């Protein structure tokens, strides 16, 4: 058996997230459907670095699967991309040892969130950025960002629907990039809770709008209560950008 690692990019707009759900189109479902065709009807389960929600995109999702087929890496790449729909692309294939695990071996993840600063919607970017029509005080956002960096209990910044009991995570970097008419929030951490990046972005936008004080972030973290943080930003501005492994 070979263990195959794939890096996957997808446009999340027409998926109900990554993970298989009955009666809904998902990324995992499409990948496993393609693998089933290649394995002559045999079901092949894939493991992913993590789930993404409905409408969330990925540039660097990572999956693995085990297979009895002996194909070269380039052959896997070509075969899968031939079988997959246009909104999913395998960008890299690597053969790994059985010690590699797409989920349990993750060392750090990078997410990016795109905000379009415009009162007018952009018809060509509407599915890929969060259009934000209100003026923002960028310096206030920059002042708030360092409070999130480090190891914290992020209960205030995750959905109540999370199934994780341990809400402690470490954020290594948050970078705010001003690029033409967009703000791009770049997050690097050892892991992120359900909706955590989107709630942090929504909170930072509330800071930029003057609804929250930048110096209120430590208090919101300490309260460990979702109701004190800002609104959650929508899914279509979020990208799983890159996943790094310790092996």
Curated annotation (Swiss-Prot):
<comment type="subunit">
    <text>Homodimer.</text>
</comment>
<dbReference type="InterPro" id="IPR001406">
    <property type="entry name" value="PsdUridine_synth_TruA"/>
</dbReference>
<dbReference type="InterPro" id="IPR020094">
    <property type="entry name" value="TruA/RsuA/RluB/E/F_N"/>
</dbReference>
<feature type="binding site">
    <location>
        <position position="111"/>
    </location>
    <ligand>
        <name>substrate</name>
    </ligand>
</feature>
<feature type="active site" description="Nucleophile">
    <location>
        <position position="53"/>
    </location>
</feature>
<keyword id="KW-0413">Isomerase</keyword>
<comment type="function">
    <text>Formation of pseudouridine at positions 38, 39 and 40 in the anticodon stem and loop of transfer RNAs.</text>
</comment>
<dbReference type="GO" id="GO:0160147">
    <property type="term" value="F:tRNA pseudouridine(38-40) synthase activity"/>
</dbReference>
<dbReference type="Pfam" id="PF01416">
    <property type="entry name" value="PseudoU_synth_1"/>
</dbReference>
<dbReference type="GO" id="GO:0003723">
    <property type="term" value="F:RNA binding"/>
</dbReference>
<keyword id="KW-0819">tRNA processing</keyword>
<dbReference type="InterPro" id="IPR020103">
    <property type="entry name" value="PsdUridine_synth_cat_dom_sf"/>
</dbReference>
<protein>
    <recommendedName>
        <fullName>tRNA pseudouridine synthase A 1</fullName>
        <ecNumber>5.4.99.12</ecNumber>
    </recommendedName>
</protein>
<dbReference type="GO" id="GO:0031119">
    <property type="term" value="P:tRNA pseudouridine synthesis"/>
</dbReference>
<comment type="similarity">
    <text>Belongs to the tRNA pseudouridine synthase TruA family.</text>
</comment>
<dbReference type="InterPro" id="IPR020097">
    <property type="entry name" value="PsdUridine_synth_TruA_a/b_dom"/>
</dbReference>
<dbReference type="InterPro" id="IPR020095">
    <property type="entry name" value="PsdUridine_synth_TruA_C"/>
</dbReference>
């Amino acid at each position: 058996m070979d263990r195959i690692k794939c890096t996957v990019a997808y446009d999340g707009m027409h998926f109900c997230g990554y993970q298989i759900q009955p009666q809904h189109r998902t990324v995992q479902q499409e990948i496993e459907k393609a693998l089933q065709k290649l394995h002559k009807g045999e079901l092949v389960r894939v493991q992913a670095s993590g789930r993404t929600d409905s409408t969330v995109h990925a540039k660097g999702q990572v999956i693995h699967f085990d297979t009895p087929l002996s194909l070269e890496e380039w052959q896997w790449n070509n075969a899968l991309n031939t079988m997959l729909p246009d909104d999913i692309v395998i960008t890299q294939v690597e053969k790994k040892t059985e010690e590699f695990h797409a989920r349990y071996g993750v060392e750090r993840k990078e997410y990016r969130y795109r905000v379009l600063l415009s009162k007018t919607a952009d018809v060509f970017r509407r599915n890929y950025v969060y259009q934000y029509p209100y003026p923002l005080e960028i310096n206030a956002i920059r002042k708030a960002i360092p409070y999130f960096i480090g190891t914290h209990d992020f209960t205030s910044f995750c959905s109540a629907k999370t199934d994780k009991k341990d809400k402690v995570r470490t954020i290594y970097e948050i970078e705010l990039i001003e690029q033409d008419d967009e703000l791009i929030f770049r997050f690097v951490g050892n892991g992120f809770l359900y909706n955590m990046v989107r709630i942090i972005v929504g909170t930072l936008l509330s800071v930029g709008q003057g609804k929250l004080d930048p110096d209120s972030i430590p208090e919101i973290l300490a309260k460990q209560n979702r109701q004190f943080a800002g609104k959650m930003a929508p899914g279509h501005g979020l990208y799983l950008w890159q996943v790094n492994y310790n092996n």
